[in-house]
Amino acid sequence: MKLEKHMIDTVKEWHLKIGYQKENIRLYYPTESVKDFLDVKNSEKLSTEELCDKVQSYLSEKMIGMGTVNVSQEENRFCIEISKELNEYIAKHIEPSEFLQEFLKALSSGNIEIVRHLFRSYAQQKQGHCIEEPHEGEAGIAFSFQEERIDPYVYCVEQGDFGLTYHRFVKTEYEKLF
């Protein structure tokens, strides 16, 4: 997955969950995640400043005509600040994921079986396969699709005192954690 796709997907997720606000948005990424997104090998000995410049240059090129981003780095994470113009561009010109919309609706039911049914039926509808992995503890059940064309993320859904909660991971990050 590319960094710009993850950024846009995250902003669209926020728009669906809390609504669009014409303001700057800050996204935080661990340094290792940024390296993965940009295919920077550990053997490449980039200083923090060089990596920060590389991210800034990469995103400036990818976001031409949409708005600006500013990249900073502190300790082991990067802050990517999306300008209100880019946020507005994403809100007006990029459609939200159909699956994510359906997922959030299923999640609001508070019923894990409705979420499970969504993943299974969506996979079947798109001629794909649903993957379901139960985890002990706070990860709950991890749902994903074998085919990334359907949706490239892993959704860890957990039943708690206040209903269903979830965390969405890029598959490579999920594999590192579990």
Predicted regions and their residues:
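Positively charged, polyanion-binding regions of nucleic-acid-associated proteins
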Residues: M1-L27, F37
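Charge-enriched amphipathic alpha-helical scaffolds
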Residues: I25, K35-T68
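Intrinsically disordered, low-complexity regulatory segments enriched in Ser/Thr/Pro
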Residues: E148-F178
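Short, hydrophobic/aromatic-rich segments at coil-to-beta transitions
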Residues: G137-F143
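Short glycine-rich, basic-tinged beta-strand/loop micro-motifs
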Residues: Q21-K41, Q101-A106
